């Protein structure tokens, strides 16, 4: 590959930009403490995981053997026997959510998808693409789904087979919908467990809850039917990706044979990235579960540090249990743009991913926010 001098200069400028901003993502859940340099040589090859990793494929350059290892690992941490599960490495959380909703729709074709107003924006797009009826549920103050409103709307709609989209960590507040509460409330109105579907969006918290002492309900053992997690968030990856796991019996409903690749098609994407499979495989093989627990504990400790610093000066910051997302009042635009914060309405958040090994970047942000919010308060009082 030969680039013109102008293009070489342009790409060099972008390289320096990336170096400058590599760790400057405190408002978004991307862990940057990774090193996949041992895998760089594989970028010489077009590795394509089209089809089902558990079957033979006539496309020789695939990483199916590694994908099998990845899926066995996630079946274990999401508490489902490997032989009863199936899933794959996706392009990201949205594809995983679509896969879960697709399975639910095939199981209950005429049912409604219920999700809270704090759910990730992609669910609206998914419902449109899958031509599913959908219903937005109110949220509690902490971002959890409003269980009373959920049951009220299911009863109002006379829904016999609701499809529940549960958040295992909402985008803005890290709130976790109570899987067990949802099942209890549905049982109270006479809906049997076999008559509804629960998909869990665990994009960030799916790699937190398995490694804390007192996790909220999140797994197949707690009653879910499918779950997805992002690979580029808590795990960390230079390429966005994700993992989705479902019950094999439900996946078999959508599976079809494809003759020209000699394998079965049961994924959303046809061609799939075989390199991200290698990244996820290396990530899970290079750390023990004890090391993951220690990494998560560090992130949680940093999150609590941020809450304490804000609260010490009277700023009402908070976080949900087992969450590394710290919520606080939205500062002025020049502050949230300076620190690349995610904002929604009158709130902003910071996320203490694992590359924050000390408090320097957190302190820099908090100092600016304190100065900004306290200055705004003084200006309001003076006026």
From Swiss-Prot:
N6-(pyridoxal phosphate)lysine, modified sites: 233
Under Gene3D superfamilies, the record lists: Type I PLP-dependent aspartate aminotransferase-like (Major domain)
Catalysed reactions, semicolon-separated: L-histidine + H(+) = histamine + CO2
Q: What is its EC number?
A: 4.1.1.22
> Which cofactor does this sequence's record say it needs?
pyridoxal 5'-phosphate
**Binding positions (substrate):** 120
Q: Which InterPro entries match?
A: Group_II_Decarboxylase, Hist_deCOase_bac, PyrdxlP-dep_de-COase, PyrdxlP-dep_Trfase, PyrdxlP-dep_Trfase_major, Pyridoxal-P_BS
Per its UniProt record, what Pfam families does this chain match?
Pyridoxal_deC
Is Hydrolase tagged as a keyword?
A: no
- Metal-binding recorded as keyword: no
- Which biological process terms from the Gene Ontology are attached to this UniProt entry? carboxylic acid metabolic process
UniProt GO molecular function: histidine decarboxylase activity; pyridoxal phosphate binding
- Keywords noted in UniProt: Decarboxylase, Lyase, Pyridoxal phosphate
The disulfide bridges present are: none
Q: How does it assemble?
A: Homotetramer.
Which NCBIfam families does its entry note? PRK02769.1 (NF002748)
**Family, as annotated:** Belongs to the group II decarboxylase family.
Q: What is the protein name for this chain?
A: Histidine decarboxylase
Organism in which the protein naturally occurs: Acinetobacter baumannii (strain ACICU)
Lineage, uppermost ranks? Bacteria, Pseudomonadati, Pseudomonadota, Gammaproteobacteria, Moraxellales
């Amino acid at each position: 590959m030969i680039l013109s001098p102008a293009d070489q200069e342009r790409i060099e400028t972008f390289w320096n930009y990336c170096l400058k901003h590599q760790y400057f993502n405190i408002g978004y859940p991307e862990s940057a403490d990774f090193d996949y340099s041992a895998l760089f040589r594989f970028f010489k090859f077009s590795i394509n995981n089209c089809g089902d990793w558990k079957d033979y494929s006539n496309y020789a350059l695939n990483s199916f053997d590694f994908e099998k290892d990845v899926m066995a690992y996630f079946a274990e941490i999401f508490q489902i026997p490997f032989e009863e599960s199936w899933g794959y490495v996706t392009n990201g959380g949205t594809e995983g959510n679509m896969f879960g909703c697709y399975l639910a729709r095939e199981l209950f074709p005429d049912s409604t998808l219920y999700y809270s107003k704090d759910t990730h924006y992609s669910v609206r797009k998914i419902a449109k693409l899958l031509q599913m009826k959908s219903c937005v549920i109110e949220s509690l103050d902490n971002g959890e789904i409003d269980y009373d409103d959920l049951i009220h709307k299911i009863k109002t709609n006379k829904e016999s087979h609701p499809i529940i989209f549960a958040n295992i960590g909402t985008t803005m507040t890290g709130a976790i919908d109570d899987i067990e509460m949802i099942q209890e409330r549905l049982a109270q109105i006479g809906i049997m467990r076999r008559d509804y579907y629960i998909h869990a969006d665990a994009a960030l918290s799916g790699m937190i809850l398995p490694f804390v002492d007192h996790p909220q309900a999140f797994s197949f053992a707690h009653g879910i039917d499918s779950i997805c997690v992002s690979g580029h968030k808590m795990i960390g990856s230079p390429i966005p990706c994700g993992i989705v796991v479902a019950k094999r019996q439900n996946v078999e409903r959508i599976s079809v044979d494809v003759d020209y690749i000699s394998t079965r098609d049961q994924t959303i994407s046809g061609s799939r990235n075989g390199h991200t499979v290698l990244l996820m495989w290396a990530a899970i093989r290079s750390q023990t579960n004890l090391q993951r627990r220690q990494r998560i504990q560090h992130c949680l400790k940093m999150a609590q540090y941020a809450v304490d610093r804000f609260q010490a000066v009277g700023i009402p910051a908070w976080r949900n249990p087992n969450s590394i997302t710290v919520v606080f009042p939205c500062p002025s635009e020049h502050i949230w743009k300076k620190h690349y914060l995610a904002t929604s309405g009158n709130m902003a958040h910071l996320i203490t991913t694992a590359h924050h090994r000390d408090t320097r970047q957190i302190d820099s942000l908090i100092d600016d926010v304190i100065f900004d919010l306290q200055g705004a308060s003084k200006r309001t009082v003076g006026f």
